[in-house]
Amino acid sequence: MMRFHKACHRFSLSPLCHLSPPSPSPASSLLLLPKLSGFSTLSTRRCVRVRRFSENPLTTVMASRSASRLRSLASACSGGAEDGGGTSNGSLSASATATEDDELAIGTGYRLPPPEIRDIVDAPPVPALSFSPHRDKILFLKRRALPPLADLARPEEKLAGVRIDGYCNTRSRMSFYTGLGIHQLLPDGTLSPEKEITGIPDGGKINFVTWSNDGKHLAFSIRVDENGNSSKPVVWVADVETGVARPLFNSQDIFLNAIFESFVWIDNSTLLVSTIPSSRGEPPKKPLVPSGPKTLSNETKTVVQVRTFQDLLKDEYDADLFDYYASSQLVLASLDGTVKEVGVPAVYTSLDPSTDHKYLLVSSLHRPYSFIVPCGRFPKKVEVWTTDGRFVRQLCDLPLAEDIPIASNSVRKGMRSINWRADKPSTLWAETQDGGDAKMEVSPRDIVYMQSAEPLAGEEPEVLHKLDLRYGGISWCDDTLALVYESWYKTRRTRTWVISPGSNDVSPRILFDRSSEDVYSDPGSTMLRRTDAGTYVIAKIKKENDEGTYVLLNGSGATPQGNVPFLDLFDINTGNKERIWESDKEKYFETVVALMSDQKEGDLKMEELKILTSKESKTENTQYSLQLWPDRKVQQITNFPHPYPQLASLQKEMIRYQRKDGVQLTATLYLPPGYDPSKDGPLPCLFWSYPGEFKSKDAAGQVRGSPNEFAGIGSTSALLWLARRFAILSGPTIPIIGEGDEEANDRYVEQLVASAEAAVEEVVRRGVADRSKIAVGGHSYGAFMTANLLAHAPHLFACGIARSGAYNRTLTPFGFQNEDRTLWEATNVYVEMSPFMSANKIKKPILLIHGEEDNNPGTLTMQSDRFFNALKGHGALCRLVVLPHESHGYSARESIMHVLWETDRWLQKYCVPNTSDADTSPDQSKEGSDSADKVSTGTGGGNPEFGEHEVHSKLRRSLL
């Protein structure tokens, strides 16, 4: 499925893939103001947990007084609302005086940021969009606002790396759509009036929206509220022509099991659905008396190194609970009401129909489970079935994979990447030849195999290709053309091979062999077209009076002046290419989104080419258009309003500068609307970034992104402080370079400080930032960066904001981020990189924020707890805020608003005046205006590390 997540909307063009809205995150679109649940008390489960420390010994007395005042206000707070009426969100009373407000900030209660920030975050969300298979209709999927904290507070089971809502039998914290509407795409490029999908229950929560192959039906799940909880999901279908929706099953006792695979279209009238087994009964009960001690043993002396995974199974009771919630009964359900159970209940994780709709690839997990790795490494069976449920054969039964090495490019032993060819019903897989250990030197390293769905007796798998790097997938076209990808992270090498799957006498050849870091040499990716079977294959293009084999290459067009996306017509045999489309370079940033003339058999004619493009500028949000050949006629099909008109005239510039070692650096500088440095003077500045590793100085210095891209502002984005008249230095590059055999992190601190110094000097030189009023911030690895900069470069920054970070690398001993040496192999590196070890050096105010339920590997909540205690133990001015029920990324409106309030308070108090005992802290929150304590204090707010897409949306690994 193609998704385009710009500032405030998203497209999907793959009708066979499930559409389910993402959980709100810093990159999510702006969302609408929801009703907030009332809180009867200000308990620690419902209110932000704040810890603070001040160098002044009087703080303890003042904190005690503040706590007493909070207790006296608790009942009043629980009855008030942010607008002065209605249900409460647990916020403090708006009648508090300025002095009381800052004292109360030391305690508990959710707060609101100033109106200029709040209004941007509360802007209405634009629907997500999905094209029909024939590209003649657009489905508008309507979304709700930021969810209330009550949604996150629902009980959840944490099992094998999965968080489960046991009442619904779904993943917990699932967001949803609230309504569906269909527009016909008219010949002139305009949209018909909306046809609303009717019949959906009031308040229905919609997920997993998918088109049938012929585009005549939609399938989706619906949950409704029952006694304060969401019901178990039920599968519904809608007739696209009439717009009428109805339940798929006649029985009201058949529910969807949405823990793993939900449902797939087998043909245009039949779905294969994962259902809750009707006979499963009540969930297992935890024994009151344990049957014995918990034991882990390694008497076989097996080397098992794993990262700090979270939410793992703890005992046999957890294993039983995992089986209970994850096990499904597969059911074939036709639109005419016919129902047939297939197979036996099992933990099915994937259902993949073949291109001819005769076979299924069925994947399932089974025991023995593990207590040290998540379910993705559990024993796994992959089988071939017919679509009516008949077992054909077993492809593999992979054992438990606890011993995958931590080195980059290490993989599971045995068959992997098992799937169908996109152009015919043949199974495809890769097998490692190095035992999965990237440190082993072997050739070949991977072998790619292919075999028909039902091989003849004695028929051996066919070797499709042998690779010396790690296999990375295949783009299929037909028996004469496919592209095989391989790469190796340590060297950043990536290669693309051309093969002829149906011709053994045609030798594979290398098409591209380059560095993945070298964005200037990126030739682009082949464009795919949709087949009648619903799969995607390489689009072959036919030119008039030309027998060449042409494909379309869609590239980002990175240049020293910024990205200029392009579309090339590429001769796969000669390497010759012709640029048939290119983005505007002066004012607009345009991209090719998808091929729209793909519902045709055979090669596509150049003169019939139709593509979907996007267009935006620094101040104009993204709109979508159709472009038709041969005359390149443009038909705009969307007209989304500006999501935050109050910042429509913000100033944006991509700036370049140099580090003292000669490395070229870039950043995006944002300035408030109407700001003139010659008249207004320098501004307070927020420096928000995220480091990245590189193998070469040249690659590190390349420009990424475009100066003409629209400034999308997420709900926790640093750009929100443009509304508070800050200069924002967004994503200043902080390359940590390890050339040759050198590991990047061997000189982490040195390169980190040098990059920050260069960025600060540049904004000061330009006269837009006051040197004494620059704050630094980031989340996850960006929070780690923030703490290190305050420890090793305190002269650069007035204060810091660190959200959901990890600060003590000895607590992640088997690697972190892109570091794959262990603590015992690189002890000095782990210690020197850990700001925890330099807590005694941090003298500038630091705000720590963390979700109480952070499940990101490496960033356990205790990282912030322990770092705060280390800082407090050395008299640092610090504040820690722990957000109840929040994970690595924050989603509840109460949490997000409080994070913004905490961040704004910190900036106004310690950056704008740049004094630790400032007596002003302007805050126009409904709950009261902030005022400084009479003693130096530090406190905290929160934001996740894993969602800052402005800086690291394309990072290769999960942030640790």
Curated annotation (Swiss-Prot):
Q: Please state which protein family the record places this protein in.
A: Belongs to the peptidase S9D family.
Q: Which UniProt keywords apply?
A: Chloroplast, Hydrolase, Plastid, Protease, Serine protease, Transit peptide
Chain's role = Serine-type protease active in vitro against the LHCII N-terminal. Cleaves its substrate on the carboxy-side of Glu residues.
Q: Which terms does the record give in the GO molecular function aspect?
A: serine-type endopeptidase activity
Question: What residues make up the catalytic site?
Answer: S780, D854, H888
The main enzyme category here is: hydrolase
Q: Which gene encodes it?
A: GEP
Q: Which pairs of positions does the record mark as disulfide bonds?
A: none
The identity of this protein, by name, is: Probable glutamyl endopeptidase, chloroplastic
Which region of this protein is its transit peptide?
1-62
Subcellular localization: Plastid, Chloroplast stroma
Q: Which domain of life is it from?
A: Eukaryota
What broad class describes the main subcellular location of this protein? plastid
